[in-house]
């Protein structure tokens, strides 16, 4: 069972590395990481490009619709995901190392 983790980002450069590393440290390894950047003006894209196995989606539109932008980011990322399960992670947050494994096992066993 493949897991997709969708990350919506806007100007969270200082948290991205911790966020991605929390996914790289997962005990469950069959996952894809999709990073949607909403036209950040900081160094977010340069930071995320250091992770070669992360799928990057760039929104280059000059819109400022607040939470609607985040919904659009999730919609676009879900459309491009290939996982059986989809997880959402904000770019200024991180997952416990067993989060994905625990949830995948729950779905497999129920």
Which role does the model predict for each range below?
Residues 21-30:
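Short, acidic, metal-binding catalytic loop of nucleotide-sugar glycosyltransferases
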Residues 86:
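Short aromatic/hydrophobic "clamp" motif used to bind/position activated sugar donors
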Residues 37-46, 61, 90:
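A conserved acidic beta->alpha catalytic loop
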Residues 60-81:
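Glycine-rich, basic loop-to-helix element that forms the pyrophosphate-binding segment
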Residues 94, 98-110:
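Conserved donor NDP-sugar-binding/catalytic core segment of glycosyltransferases
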Residues 1-22:
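N-proximal low-complexity "stem/linker" segments adjacent to membrane-targeting elements
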Residues 15-17, 42-50, 94, 98:
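Acidic helix N-cap motif at the loop->helix transition within catalytic regions
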């Amino acid at each position: 069972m493949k897991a997709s983790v969708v990350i919506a980002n806007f100007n969270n450069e200082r948290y991205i590395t911790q966020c991605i590393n929390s996914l790289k440290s997962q005990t469950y390894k069959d996952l894809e990481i999709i990073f949607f950047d909403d036209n950040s003006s900081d160094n977010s894209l340069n930071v995320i490009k250091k992770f070669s196995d992360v799928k990057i989606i760039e929104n280059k539109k000059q819109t400022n619709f607040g939470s609607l932008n985040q919904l659009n980011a999730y919609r676009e990322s879900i459309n491009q995901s290939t996982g059986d399960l989809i997880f959402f992670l904000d770019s200024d947050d991180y997952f416990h190392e067993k989060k994905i494994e625990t949830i995948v096992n729950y779905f497999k066993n129920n």
